[in-house]
């Protein structure tokens, strides 16, 4: 999936912005008690399953853990957030 805003923006990834994103990722992993290795295993498994049914676009692919408020009791809960752009759905008859 082509992100037109990203293509036409003047925003270049600086080492500062990359370091900031990495630090955010480390902090989120610490808060949700999920190691980067575990998240990578989850990501790999999810992508394998989806690849059985659709062709995945690598650009824009993002899978991460985050904290959010619970729906019923407002307690913090861990959430797996995935943005997986698809090129097309495979035609499969079962």
UniProtKB/Swiss-Prot annotation:
Keywords: Cell cycle, Cell division. SUPFAM superfamilies: Cell division protein MinE topological specificity domain. One of its GO terms (biological process) is regulation of division septum assembly. It comes from the Bacteria. InterPro entries: MinE (IPR005527), MinE_sf (IPR036707). The keyword Cell division applies. Transmembrane segments: none annotated. Prevents the cell division inhibition by proteins MinC and MinD at internal division sites while permitting inhibition at polar sites. This ensures cell division at the proper site by restricting the formation of a division septum at the midpoint of the long axis of the cell. Belongs to the MinE family. This is Cell division topological specificity factor. The lineage of its organism: Bacteria, Bacillati, Bacillota, Clostridia, Peptostreptococcales.
């Amino acid at each position: 999936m082509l992100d037109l805003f990203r293509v036409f923006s003047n925003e270049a990834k600086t080492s500062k912005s990359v370091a900031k994103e990495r630090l955010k990722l480390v902090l989120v992993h610490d808060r949700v008690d999920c190691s980067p290795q575990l998240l990578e295993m989850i990501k790999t498994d999810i992508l394998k399953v989806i690849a059985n049914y659709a062709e995945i676009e690598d650009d824009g692919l993002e899978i991460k853990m985050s904290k959010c408020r619970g729906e019923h009791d407002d307690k913090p809960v861990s959430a797996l957030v995935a943005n997986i752009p698809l090129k097309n759905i495979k035609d499969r008859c079962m």
